[in-house]
Amino acid sequence: MSIALQVALVMVTILVILLIIGAPIGVAIGLSSAVSMICMIPANVSFATSAQRIFAGSNSFSLIAIPFFILAGNIMNNGGIATRLVNCAKVIAGRMPGALAQSNVVANMLFGAISGSGAAAAAAMGSTIGPLEEKEGYDKNYSVAVNVASAPVGMLIPPSNTMIVYSSIAGSVSIAALFMAGYIPGILWGGAVMILAGIMAKKRGYQAEERVTFKIAMKTFWQAIPSLLLIVIVIGGILVGVFTATEGSAIAVVYATVLSLIYKSFKLKDIPRIVLESAKTTGIITFMIGLSSIMSWAMAFTEIPDMIATAILGLTDNKILILLLINVLLLIVGTFMDVTPAILIFTPILLPICTAFGMSPIQFGILLCFNLSIGTITPPVGTILFTGCRVGGVTIESVIKYMLPYFAIIFVALLLVTYIPAISMFLPKILGLV
């Protein structure tokens, strides 16, 4: 057994043990990487290299967009924007069977597109639409299942922090192209949930709402336009080259702050609290990115990506089977690991395999985010699942059986994204981004 393989086994073993005993993911990544580096090079060189890699890994202009988008999302979550989006969604989906559940899905897509956070969308919609559904006699488990199943769409529809993290790790992958690539898969996910929610609503006898007048519909849309305009300004500005994703994220913060103050949904004294919440989240993400940079260097040094690629390619050279194996691996990883560290760890390992089979790094990025987004709604560490159940006042055990049909239809959507490149690549190509 080569020294590189021995070191790789040490690193993986320490990482797995630390995760099993409940160590924070950042600590597990950093400690396992540091030990493996000490095994390869002298301690003084190892410590110096680790410090340099932490700084280099987090010293990226594109990563500055993450704290700004997090702050913008938190401002909007506290700024009364959710209510206006819910009203808009009710007009769009009000005539469908199970109107409130359908409105929940549409509102999650809209709110997720603005905030970029699936957990924030689940919390906002659960506290806004949930009480309305209960008043109309909807089963609470059914309502929570629809909310949880549709909330991760916000991680695919831009702006998406997960795509920014992937772009920083993957290298020369355009953030604008990734943003555009996420639209159709995100809408596909949301549409699949709406179809199933409608079928189940019909069986349960949940009716459509009364038709609203044209005047009320226009008034509702008009009230939602300022919130939705944020998407147009940020994504449109990035696409036409007026500003970068980082500059667009700063504009999003200013716009969200001004809009929330105009709505009088919060006061200036609330801003320090919101900034502190955003800083905590940003600190966690940046910490993991820096430490994951050490792991990426250690994996490259020990040739772990090459060994894994050789092992997978040794099983079969069939592209369909290899992509299926990668999906299964990512689904398992997403069940036990949060999205950001999973992207940081597995992008250097799996991206070379997929590109070797002719898959675009953009399509792989969407495939990666899609798989790991499913992990956010599966136990034992599904953040969106926990958030939705907590806000909805139900237990995870009771809602899981209602989730099973949604898992099935989301897996079908995943296979379509995997094997039909046009779903991810159509918009980037037509807009000249690739």
Please give the residue ranges for each predicted region:
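Alpha-helical transmembrane segments of multi-pass membrane transport proteins
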Residues: 1-434
